[in-house]
Swiss-Prot record:
Signal peptide: none annotated. It holds the Pfam family Na_H_antiport_1. Belongs to the NhaA Na(+)/H(+) (TC 2.A.33) antiporter family. It is found in: Cell inner membrane. This is Na(+)/H(+) antiporter NhaA. One of its GO terms (biological process) is regulation of pH. The chain crosses the membrane at residues 26-46, 71-91, 107-127, 137-157, 166-186, 189-209, 212-232, 233-253, 273-293, 299-319, 340-360, 373-393. Keywords: Antiport, Cell inner membrane, Cell membrane, Ion transport, Membrane, Sodium, Sodium transport, Transmembrane, Transmembrane helix, Transport. Its main location: membrane. NCBIfam families: NhaA, PRK09560.1, PRK09561.1. One of its GO terms (cellular component) is plasma membrane. It comes from Haemophilus influenzae (strain PittGG).
Amino acid sequence: MNFLLCIFKGVYVIKLIQRFFKLESAGGILLLFSAVVAMLLANSPLSNQYNDFLNLPVSLQIGSFSINKTLIHWINDGFMAVFFVLVGMEVKKELFEGALSTYQQAIFPAIAAIGGMVIPAVVYWFIAKQDPSLANGWAIPMATDIAFALGIMALLSKQVPLPLKIFLLALAIIDDLGAIVVIALFFSHGLSVQALIFSAVAIIALILLNRFKVSALCAYMVVGAILWASVLKSGVHATLAGVIIGFSIPLKGKKGERPLDDFEHILSSWSSFVILPLFAFANAGVSFAGIDVNMISSPLLLAIASGLIIGKPVGIFGFSYISVKLGLAKLPDGINFKQIFAVAVLCGIGFTMSMFLASLAFDANAGESVNTLSRLGILLGSTVSAILGYLFLKQTTKLS
């Protein structure tokens, strides 16, 4: 009898897990859970073990070629490159077939996204300008964590109009493009000509694979791995290799198959349920030891939090509203400016993407206090934006 009861409970638990992973908000919930676990570990008696685990040296060697990095760097440079493969594929799909495929469809979210990148950077600069050592952090509040934002929106999925979801997705994709440009232009250092030549050869190989509509995903994975390693050694940030790989995968194969859709389907689950939660676990572990109330007035914390809480909604909503009033763009049918403002507030959830940019802006040499304050600013700004965004979205969509 006990044996049958155990089997019944096991089946019930499996069904609950399966039901959870089918939820639209599952990725966002898992992200939040990973971040909370990281913070609990960082502020518990296990904090040393947590940090030792993240700083565990991991080496890869093939002949004379070797990559030696700590586990957290493998997560940030390697796993996040895989995430950016997915970003590259999503951007390509939307540009050629989706919400960004025509001028009329693309211009409204494009203008909104520009505002959502420029104004947060300006807010950050205005608050942090007195300390030159903080100058590199201007890009941190520019980012939007699309997984979290869509997860919050999914909690209200039954009452959120479809055009509003499409607007958020298009906005986030253009936001990702902006982040890619920022990484390429401002966070690539000490370039190696030899590694760049290897990278160029790998890119040419990917272009040829695309040109001949090769559908075998393993071919892109092999060449992509070579590209990633070359880009990593070149001094350009390795996540850019992911974007190039994503763009190289063809939308359609020779026989009408859709390699990009197939690969996107595979990677989306890995991204939502493994890569991003792992990144959150590795980067959200902020220790509160030694932190006092006075730190809340720190220019770095205030600059990041204000950029996310104030800069994002002001930039997105302001640029959207002005573009429509000047006749540069048209408000999509089925949504209103109150809902646009709610989405703009929601886009202040920078979380994993902001933490990623912070890891590029402030390396280990910046000091523990700078890294801690930057992560605290991101957590504060993202939490406030998530709560306010949810409340505004609930109110504005209920009225519609």
